[in-house]
Amino acid sequence: MSIILAKKSGFCYGVKRAVDTCLKIKQNYPDKIIYTLGPLIHNNDVVDFLKTKNIFSIGYENIDTLKEGDIIILRSHGVTLETIQKLKEKKLNIIDATCPYVSNIQKKAQKYYKEGYSILIVGDKNHPEVIGINGWCNNSAIICRKAEEIEDLPKKICVVSQTTEKKEHWISVLSKVVNECREVVAFNTICNATEVRQLSAEDLSKEVDFMIVIGSKSSSNTTKLYEICKNNCSNTIHIENAGELPDYISNKYSKIGVTAGASTPDWIIKEAIFKMSNKNLNEQLEYMENNDIQISIGQEVEGEIVSIVSSNEAYVNIGYKSDAILLLSEVTKDNDEDINNFVKKGDIIKGKIIKLGSENKPPVISVIELNRENAYVELKEAFENKEKVVVKVKEDVNGGLISIYKNIVRVFIPASHVELRHVDDLSIYKGCELTVNIIEFEEGRNNTRIVASRRDLLKEEQSKVEEETWSSLEKDTIKEGEVRRLTDFGAFVNINGVDGLLHVSEISWGRVEKPSDMLKVGDKIKVYIKDIDKDKKKLALSIKDLTKDPWKDVEVKYPVGNIVLGTVVRFASFGAFVELEPGVDGLIHISQISHKRVDRVEDELSIGEQVKAKIVEVDGEKRKIGLSIKEVNDI
């Protein structure tokens, strides 16, 4: 005969935590009677064991018999919010041993009820866990175990599950809800330990001749284990302890399977196996001992994400007697992040144990600590080999940017190394990913100083672009550029990373006093490459050469003897210059303004004034046109 114990069976984390909490409280108060509000867990043997320690279960109806200062422990299944308020009013010493998974469901029910959602609980309406959850949404929840039990559904609904419910029930109910409701928020709150235990029992029950399910007859999860096993193995029995084992089993069956509910302690399982095998120890007991792994600080472990209880924490099944907790701070250094952005339920992760578990708290696992050493090695290699790395900016500080590498290692970027030019507001980089070079890696006794530069990479990129641009530029071609800088003598125009000078005299055929009168920084303009010296990296540009020289054929356009209309644009001591068209000015000599004596030009004319004048001279080669106002007046 062989006895096979299911790989996952017996106490779950929440149950063990509740029992351990009771025993620890008793150690702290050895002379006091301790009370639990209802049976601490669904296991009569454990409840009887607690009685021997002066830890007694009382019903809700007996709360009024308690006195101020009495110790009352909330059962692992949780209680209603109203019950907690009543206990507080009596000024009792309340110890909360509610399973963390159940507490999570209670908080969700309360939150979404306050936001206007109807709450639907997939589970047994008479189970204390479900009764407790319902109490966190004003006892208004819709409670069912199967889809066919639901009739009229509200349009806005939040769905949760009893932690020990069958997955098939959850799926059937959720399918109906999704099809009939307009707005659905659903949380699969079936405890992973329950699901794993059920799968393990199902697999084992298909392989054996006889199946034994150990646990309280009042335990919901144990009853479900029995139903699952019975479906696969007709020779399945449900017992509470070894005393209920039939005598014929050992002689009649050669392959016996054993599983146990979440409220069944190891000693009850061992007692049952011992009775069947008639040995002090056998392979299955050894398996139980070996399966109860030991952990130590710094130990590398691998596990599965079994639940994400908030934006800051998740639980990981590492094969230990309780799940480990993974905090956001142990995944990333960015406190503004959400742990859901890094892990999902079902993910397999690796980490290091950084805190051992206690009676009331699970062990803590860190992804950061496992990856930190590798991250430092990578950054050191990047520094030595001058390789690029990508960092994410966390915040701007006086003097630069604080960034993180792989959500673990702090890297500082000085303000002068962020861009090629000075940046006034560094806050615009918060949350951005930047590619940088490590320019300083200094290992100290207590920390490592790491400094990076983005400017150096930008310089390299700029140099590459400049070289490509210089290779492509040719004299007497037209390019598009951007005005980057203005001076009194011209404008600097950038063409694909190369700056060229647009002299003030090349902006227009007309007279330009200041470049800023015609252009502004940021303007996109077309320019003519007037001259280029690739060796000296000099580029002369022109806008006016994009248009025809207005002095060409000027004798034809402005024949001598004709009257022309122009605009006075500037004065000289010897006369006034009149613009005939952009780039073509004529001179009215002071002697040609009037028949009377003119001492000052500005006494007779004003800037911007339009005047008629006779063309008296045209010299295209010397770019001169002589005009006369007084000869117009003679006509």
Swiss-Prot record:
Reactions that this protein is recorded to catalyse: isopentenyl diphosphate + 2 oxidized [2Fe-2S]-[ferredoxin] + H2O = (2E)-4-hydroxy-3-methylbut-2-enyl diphosphate + 2 reduced [2Fe-2S]-[ferredoxin] + 2 H(+); dimethylallyl diphosphate + 2 oxidized [2Fe-2S]-[ferredoxin] + H2O = (2E)-4-hydroxy-3-methylbut-2-enyl diphosphate + 2 reduced [2Fe-2S]-[ferredoxin] + 2 H(+)
What Gene3D superfamilies does the database record attribute to this sequence?
3.40.50.11270, 4-hydroxy-3-methylbut-2-enyl diphosphate reductase, catalytic domain, Nucleic acid-binding proteins
Active-site residue numbers: 129 (proton donor)
Q: In which pathway does it act?
A: Isoprenoid biosynthesis; dimethylallyl diphosphate biosynthesis; dimethylallyl diphosphate from (2E)-4-hydroxy-3-methylbutenyl diphosphate: step 1/1; Isoprenoid biosynthesis; isopentenyl diphosphate biosynthesis via DXP pathway; isopentenyl diphosphate from 1-deoxy-D-xylulose 5-phosphate: step 6/6
The cofactor remark states: Binds 1 [4Fe-4S] cluster per subunit.
**Quick one: which residues bind isopentenyl diphosphate?**
42, 77, 127, 219-221, 263
Q: Which Pfam families match?
A: LYTB, S1
EC numbers, comma separated = 1.17.7.4
Please give the Gene Ontology molecular function terms for this protein. Answer: 4 iron, 4 sulfur cluster binding; 4-hydroxy-3-methylbut-2-enyl diphosphate reductase activity; metal ion binding; nucleic acid binding
User: What is the organism field in this record?
Assistant: Clostridium tetani (strain Massachusetts / E88)
What is the designated name of this protein?
4-hydroxy-3-methylbut-2-enyl diphosphate reductase
